[in-house]
UniProtKB/Swiss-Prot annotation:
The active site is at E44. InterPro entries: Metalloenz_LuxS/M16 (IPR011249), Peptidase_M44 (IPR005072). Seems to be involved in viral proteins maturation by cleavage at Ala-Gly-|-Xaa motifs. It is an enzyme of class 3 (hydrolase). Zn(2+) binds at H41, H45. The keyword Ribosomal protein does not apply. GO terms for biological process: proteolysis; viral life cycle. This is Probable metalloendopeptidase G1-type.
């Protein structure tokens, strides 16, 4: 680890696939509370800009921090190019960027609204802790920000000026004199302390139960944010599933998720005690995303994570015992947050400005002081890789499992790969639980891309496909048909979602061309993401959720490289109507 004079920390991580990865603590959604929700996320979208033909890059905004990374496409750019590109997002020749014209901001706000729509159609993107801390269930920005468009540049400028050296963490894959000089002359010259200290209002959350869609019964127990408690939680995270942590407003919560309601009840009633045995040596080996989260979330961890190995492996017993005392003291006094699975369409909280269907109540669980049973947690196994074919009957369940557990899904031609550390029995237990099955079926929007794809590539009518939704993925991937695009170039339908999809063909159409189209549509604020799959040579199926379906359709129809196309435009409604979707099936007998 290298520490610049201003407190910026630089770590060399040769195992990462990100050539440069930069995080900023105290720079997330929390900073928007009391002001315009979404400023942090808007700033993320404004800052990141790169040539998609030379680099792969991304950024994310969390509750308490923001992070950015960039890596070159080999043969098209170098590692130093990636470092220069990321630095250019924050610095120009005059120093730290803080001037953002209104003319560009409005398009980013439109993109934020599309991201909000996408995330709430495909995922349950709700933040219970920020909501209870006077934020909202969704804090990523909405179209209503346009009402205060003239105020936003000044707010963005002030937000940028809060960046200080001690809050910056940098991971680099390779460090040489050029990279070190670039970092030292930019991030290394940030102020060591803020020029202004904003007034913050501390929020007392207390004990609450929030009822919202969730695959598990989750309890967030407040504990002291001491170094030993933090290290103890990291130990538990390393060896057990469904154990994690959350931070909000400088408060630390250790989270336990339960598959069965009776385990959750026993834990809060005190009749069951968690088995938190540390049964193997702790290695503190984490992925770069989790490690960045740790460094940014906990200012007390100022050293390299491996400097704490001796402590966690020699003082494990006393550390865990101390954490347990904190946990059960908070459970006794009701200082915890419960996320209780609920999928009802009738419950609504009028204080929720995002109009999500949720309700908040005070917990009424009586604590019994004599534990009589032990609650075992799922142990993490060695790293495994699960391959699920698109034709697998349980394909959608596995996708929902990966999303619910925040696992990355690697897409391939005939299926997906998911890396995990579950035993086969544990996966079976989760997939067969009532709560998970309800959660898996509570977001049907993701299936639309497979429904329409099946219509185009299979010999089935839309009526047949709708009658067999659960097996539609199998229909998508077993075709051997030749697709011929006819005179009808557009179908207008009504579903429970707003999206544009279809088949696009042209001799010069490639995946790179479609990626370029995606970025152009994003810059116009018309979409958040675009999914595509190649069906035949130079013929692709495209799908994108959007709140501007007509604008997206007009843009796609104007692309001259698309010599043939058939577009499906879905208008959102309370009922489904696919009646316009007709096709001819030609059978050749030989």
């Amino acid at each position: 680890m290298i520490v610049f004079d201003n407190g910026t920390r630089v770590f060399i991580n040769s195992s990462t696939n990100k050539d440069i990865y930069v995080g900023f603590s105290g720079f997330g959604f929390e900073k928007d509370i009391g002001g315009i929700l979404g400023i942090a996320h808007l700033l993320e979208h404004i800052l990141i800009s790169f040539d998609a033909s030379r680099f792969v890059a991304n950024a994310s905004t969390a509750r308490s921090y923001m992070s950015f990374w960039c890596t070159p496409i080999r043969g098209r750019a170098t590692s130093v190019d990636a470092v220069r590109t990321l630095i250019s997002w924050f610095f120009d020749k005059d120093g730290l960027k803080d001037d953002f014209p209104v003319s560009k901001i409005k398009y980013h706000i439109k993109e934020l609204e599309n991201e909000y729509y996408f995330r709430n159609e495909v995922f349950h993107c709700m933040d219970a802790l920020t909501f209870l801390a006077n934020g909202d269930l969704y804090n990523g920005g909405r179209l209503s920000m346009l009402d205060r468009l003239e105020d936003i540049p000044l707010i963005l400028r002030d937000r940028m000026r809060t960046i200080i050296g001690p809050n910056v963490v940098i991971f680099v894959r390779e460090l040489n004199d050029v990279v070190l000089s670039l970092l030292a002359n930019t991030f290394g010259r940030l102020p060591a302390c803020p020029l202004t200290i904003p007034c913050t209002v501390r929020t007392i959350i207390g004990g609450k139960t929030i009822m919202m869609p969730s695959p598990f019964y989750t309890v967030m127990v407040r504990v002291e944010p001491s170094l030993h408690n933090i290290l103890s939680i990291l130990c538990l995270y390393e060896i057990y599933h469904l154990v994690d942590y959350e931070t909000v407003d400088n408060k630390l919560y250790v989270t336990f998720s339960f598959i069965h309601e009776h385990d959750y009840e026993r834990f809060l009633q005190g009749s069951g005690r968690l088995n938190l045995t540390i049964y193997k040596k702790i290695r503190l080996c984490y992925g770069d995303d989790f490690l960045m989260n740790v460094y940014l979330s906990f200012p007390c961890i100022r050293h390299d994570i491996f400097d704490y190995l001796t402590i966690v492996n020699t003082d494990t017993s006393s550390m865990i015992s101390s954490l347990e005392r904190d946990i059960y003291q908070s459970v006794r006094t009701g200082d915890y947050i419960v996320v209780y699975p609920n999928f009802s369409n009738t419950m609504s909280n009028t204080a929720d400005r995002q109009l999500h269907k949720t309700v908040v109540i005070n917990p009424n669980i009586v604590y019994a002081s004599q534990p009589t049973t032990s609650i075992d947690l799922m142990k993490k196994q060695t790293h495994n890789e699960m391959y699920i074919k698109y034709s697998d009957a349980g394909f959608i369940d596995y996708v929902q499992l990966a999303l619910g557990l925040r696992r990355k899904i690697h897409k391939h031609v005939h299926g997906i790969h998911i890396r995990h550390q579950f035993s086969a029995d544990d996966i079976k237990t989760i997939l067969e639980s009532d709560t998970f099955m309800k959660y898996s079926k509570s977001k049907p929007a993701a299936m639309y891309q497979y429904l329409i794809l099946s219509f185009f590539v299979s010999g089935n009518t839309i009526e047949d496909i709708l009658q067999h939704r659960e097996s539609v993925v199998k229909l998508c991937r077993t075709y051997k048909n030749k697709i011929v695009l006819g005179k009808q170039t557009r179908y207008d339908i009504q579903t429970l979602s707003s999206f544009v999809c279809g088949i696009f063909k042209g001799p010069s159409v490639t995946s790179e061309y479609l990626t370029d189209i995606m970025w152009k549509l994003k810059r116009k604020g018309l979409i958040y993401s675009l999914e595509f799959v190649e069906l035949q040579k130079n013929m692709f199926y495209l799908f994108m959720f959007t709140i501007y379906p007509e604008d997206v359709t007009t843009y796609l129809s104007s692309r001259k490289l698309f010599t043939s196309r058939c577009v499906v435009v879905s208008k959102k409604g309370n009922t489904e109507d696919f009646s316009s979707m007709k096709k001819d099936i030609i059978i050749k007998l030989r």
